[in-house]
Amino acid sequence: MKNRFNSEDKIILAIDGLDLNQAKLLLEKCPSIKWVKVGLELFVREGPRVVEILKGLNKKIFLDLKFHDIPNTMSAACFQVSKLGVDIISVHSSAGLKALQDSKKASLEGASLANLKPPFVVGITVLTSFSLKDFQTDLDRKNSIEDNVLRLAKLSFDAELDGCVCSPWEVKMLRSIYKNNFELITPGIRLKIDNKDDQNRIMTPNEAIDNGASKLVIGRSISKALDPNKALIEIFKSIDSD
């Protein structure tokens, strides 16, 4: 049996699509949630105060804004959000090595200025919404998703980021390369009874953990459940079991 504390630390509840009051109500229903993902929609609607409110509820925060711009702009954004006290921030690995290096450095500087623990910075590889066909057609790519994930994960690693975000389909491949010194955060997590919605490269929680995922980003499987806490407990059980 795996350690329950460890299992609780592996689940990041995505509250995208909820307003702040709905998010707080969901967290009241799921008191064992330690991690919350704040995406672009909620952050734009509520502003930085959403971070302050969630920190007041003693939650760890993955601020998933997926920064992607020129190095100066990306690093300036990372500097600012690192002063908010978030625990993980995301940047697009495809922005390039310098942008990633500068973003990591800026996150350390911002946190230091605010006397806070620096956040992990993780690189986005290939979004889980892409199927192979859409990826190759829409982005005019000739090689596979796996090849692109490998390239972007290496870029993140070489820039000394703390990890990367990938679909559960690529976790096993990356874990075999980077062992245990690189965070692998996986969205695209669905229960067997769920619709896949707008996700394509999906996997169950237990499968993703077994393949080597560090943390799972789960939203609708919990937030849309008739009993969110029951759904959460079932997820804990599935990743606790050997």
UniProtKB/Swiss-Prot annotation:
User: Which residue positions are annotated as catalytic?
Assistant: 66 (proton donor)
What family does the database annotate?
Answer: Belongs to the OMP decarboxylase family. Type 1 subfamily.
**Species, as recorded:** Prochlorococcus marinus (strain MIT 9312)
According to UniProt, this protein's pathway is:
Pyrimidine metabolism; UMP biosynthesis via de novo pathway; UMP from orotate: step 2/2
* GO cellular component terms listed in the entry, alphabetical order: cytosol
Q: What keywords does the record list, in alphabetical order?
A: Decarboxylase, Lyase, Pyrimidine biosynthesis
User: SUPFAM superfamilies, alphabetically?
Assistant: Ribulose-phoshate binding barrel
Q: What is its EC number?
A: 4.1.1.23
Q: Please explain the role this protein plays, according to its UniProt record.
A: Catalyzes the decarboxylation of orotidine 5'-monophosphate (OMP) to uridine 5'-monophosphate (UMP).
Assembly and partners are described as: Homodimer.
What InterPro entries does this protein's entry cite? Aldolase_TIM (IPR013785), OMPdecase (IPR014732), OMPdecase_AS (IPR018089), OMPdecase_bac (IPR047596), OMPdeCOase_dom (IPR001754), RibuloseP-bd_barrel (IPR011060)
Gene for this chain: pyrF
- State the name under which the record lists this protein: Orotidine 5'-phosphate decarboxylase
